[in-house]
Amino acid sequence: MKQLVVERNNPVPVIWDTPIPQPGPNEVLIKNYYSVVSSGTELASIESANKTVTDKLQDSSNISKGLDLLKKEGLGAVIEAVFPKNVLPLQLGYSSCGEVIQAGKNVKDFHVGDKVVSNGSHAEYVAVNQNLCSRIPDDTSEKEAAFTVLGSIALHGLRLSDTTLGSKIVVIGLGIVGQLVCRLAEAQGCEVIGVDPDEKRTLDRNNFYTSIDDAINDKSINSENVDAVIITAASSSNEPIEVATRIARNKAKIVVVGDIPLNISRNDFYYKELELVVSKSYGPGRYDKQYEVLGNDYPIEHVRWTENRNFSAFLQLLQTNQISLSDMITEEIDFIDAPSIYEKFESDDKPLSIVLRYELTNEPKLDFEKTDISTPSSNGKIKLGIIGAGNFASTTILPILRDLKRECEVIGVASSGGLSAEV
């Protein structure tokens, strides 16, 4: 299958041919129909993959980690950490939809042929835990359903704002997630003001402004009527949080969804008794192994809106036409052309969103075949087969074995993950 990845020290994403992943007991294998490019997160991944040693030294935490490693494991370990011999490429993408073509033995709620959304990457096939999938309702656009994971990020941030019918919300940053927050808040009956310096993102909306001062001058907001500020911008500047504290009313809530610094002024929060919340991705369950790997759900009476229930809620809004996303899709392109699109997000005329379209091919053959393999002729080397090619095996064990090529020979590697098996 084909998968979009970013390699270390290569600023242009590439498409790799990798084995189709094998779903685990709590996973489903999905043939992707569409996936949505999340420019902010994915460009950050590309930038991270291309950081030089000098760039990394700018982060004081890396220096501390290096000194600790030097004390514990010596100079060789530090050199290996800075200049690794074998580094897995980064997968891109996390909001897609497609069709279930195989289900793990513990999966009860999904069956072959189901149309589902997932947080799968930009790849022809993805293996995803059942708690990170949701069935697409009938009469729902699959193309719009592909936005569900991004929509759930927006929905979780909105839930954390504790706003209700009639609340006034200011959304700072009108990229994909910011636009989704605005639409969800309006569907909830809130009054929404959007702010983004990119004029193209504020056109055709009377309640969108290129600066907060424009909104104040237009008398859309003042420091007494803003119930919540949701920051969906990505910035290295402290300006978003400073603006939020300036415009929020007393006892208002500020929710940070985007990647921004939080150099906050205590006095700004003290005198207004402001509440600051940093939103974690799609909602409760995120990064919890029990939920995302082992497939254990949270009881609804204790956790009403898990990430999976957020997926379902967003899909229901699409099905009932309470929100529509067709006008948010700037471009739709074939997946095979995906490597060329990222430079568009760096241009002055950057698109709001791009949807990748996958070719609907015949089903792959997923059954294992038993093959007779003749014993290799002896050359005095120890023959090794590796089962499991995770991060530790790929970055530590396999490089060591390569250094021992006079003594041993790796004749095969098996892994449930297509990308790690290819590496």
Residue ranges: model-predicted function:
Residues 196-197, 280, 412-417:
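Conserved acidic E/D residue at the C-terminus of a beta-strand in Rossmann-like folds
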Residues 198-201, 261, 417-419:
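Helix N-cap at the beta1-alpha1 junction of Rossmann-like dinucleotide-binding domains, i.e.
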